[in-house]
Structure formats: structure tokens, C-alpha cells
């Protein structure tokens, strides 16, 4: 997936979510610059 490759190359943080639920504040963390949503 290109978004993952770009994030690794650029050294930026990414998060993967399914359905938008996150109890650990991983997706909404300001350091996360890329969010991959795998929900339908």
C-alpha cells in the first residue's frame, strides 16, 4: 500500500482503524499524519 510506504519513507506516524473506535487515542494523536481506514 502506497500510504504505508510513503509514511515509512518519510518517517511519519500512521494509524490503521476499523470503524473509528480507538480507546488508546492512537488515531486522534496529533503526531499521526496518516490514517488508513479499513472499514466498509
Swiss-Prot record:
Database matches in InterPro entries: FAD-bd_PCMH_sub2 (IPR016169)
Protein name, per record: Uncharacterized protein in drrB 3'region
Amino acid at each position: 500500500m502506497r500510504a504505508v510506504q510513503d509514511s515509512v519513507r518519510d518517517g511519519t506516524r500512521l494509524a490503521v482503524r476499523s470503524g473509528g473506535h480507538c480507546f488508546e487515542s492512537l488515531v486522534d494523536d496529533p503526531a499521526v499524519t496518516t490514517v488508513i481506514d479499513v472499514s466498509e
